[in-house]
A protein has these predicted regions:
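The conserved SAM/SAH-binding core of class I Rossmann-like methyltransferase domains
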Residues: 2-4, 51, 87, 120
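Terminal hydrophobic/aromatic helix or amphipathic segment near a protein terminus
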Residues: 186-237
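Conserved catalytic-site loops of classical short-chain dehydrogenases/reductases
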Residues: 46-49, 82-86, 118
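A general structural signal for well-ordered alpha-helical segments in protein cores
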Residues: 45, 69, 103, 132, ...
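Short, amphipathic alpha-helical "lid/cap" segments that border enzyme active or binding sites
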Residues: 39, 73, 155-163, 245-253
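Oxidoreductase cofactor-interface core, primarily capturing Rossmann-like NAD(P)-dependent enzymes
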Residues: 4-9, 14, 35, 56, ...
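NAD(P)H-binding glycine-rich loop region in Rossmannoid oxidoreductase-like domains
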Residues: 7-71, 75-78
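Amphipathic terminal alpha-helices
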Residues: 232-259
């Protein structure tokens, strides 16, 4: 496993995400943007999986989501890996955010590479939906379009899906999501019910987005791009093939005490 911080990887993560302690045969600790570190990452690996990407870090998505993944792909090709599985994002080619442009650029490069390419596009993650539960704790959830649909997936279910695809060894691209499809209104009410609050859902007018994103970009282009990515997904259906056995309502119930 290639990580920046082994100690962090061996601790339980947010929302009870599991530690990797005792599960990794060999650690590679370093900076994936450094060519000397990346060139031999895939040495001895029969298959490569990359979920590498910018989340809340201050790094440039183009450097990480595209170029660093290309360096890992080059290592996989150099050392003869049989397949390369990439965790992308559903709808990335249509989303205007810099983050998704970087992901799309790498996904296209992977498809052209001389390796069995497997591109997995999750709709959203349960962990992403904790922001809705935090709003629900305050008694009201604010959304844009109540009819837009999504089916978030638990990270463990996504991992099972990826392992199944690796075992099959087929080349392709798959849009995946969890077993439950929600409208945003239904998701908001699920969060409010988990927090034992009255079903108070407010609608944010979409006309506010251009000036709000423009104002945010004056102070932080990174935050503006993250907001552009998040709001785009809230305004477009993000529904993948139903996968897994874990349900968001149960996840909310298990983690309500952590918000």
């Amino acid at each position: 496993a290639a990580v920046r911080d082994r100690a962090r990887a061996e601790k339980e993560g947010p929302w009870k995400s599991p530690s990797l302690e005792g599960l990794v045969e060999e650690w590679a600790v370093g900076d994936v943007t450094e060519p000397d570190f990346a060139k031999d990452l895939a040495k001895g690996a029969a298959q490569v999986v990359s979920a590498l990407g910018v989340t809340r870090q201050k790094a440039d998505p183009w450097q990480i989501d595209n170029l660093a993944n290309r360096a890992i792909l080059a290592s996989a090709l150099r050392h003869g890996a049989a397949s390369f599985t990439y965790v992308n994002v559903l709808g990335g080619e249509a989303c205007p955010a810099k983050l998704t442009r970087a992901k799309t650029a790498f996904a296209r490069a992977l498809k052209r590479a001389g390796v069995v390419s497997q591109i997995v596009n999750p709709s959203a993650y349960f962990s992403d939906m904790m922001s809705v539960l935090k709003m629900a704790k305050r008694g009201k959830v604010h959304i844009f379009d109540p009819a837009i649909r999504l089916n978030p997936i638990h990270g463990a279910d996504l991992a099972v899906c990826i392992c199944d695809l690796m075992e099959k060894g087929e080349k392709g691209s798959w849009d995946v999501g969890g077993p439950d499809v929600f409208t945003w209104d239904e998701l908001a009410r699920t969060a409010l019910a988990a927090m034992e609050k009255q079903p108070r859902v407010g609608k944010i007018p979409t006309w506010i987005l251009p000036p709000a994103l423009g104002l945010t970009s004056l102070f932080s282009r990174r935050l503006a791009d993250a907001a552009r990515f998040a709001t785009w997904n809230m305004l477009h259906d993000c529904v993948g093939s139903a996968t897994g056995v874990r349900h968001l309502a149960d996840f909310y119930a298990e983690n309500r005490g952590l918000v």
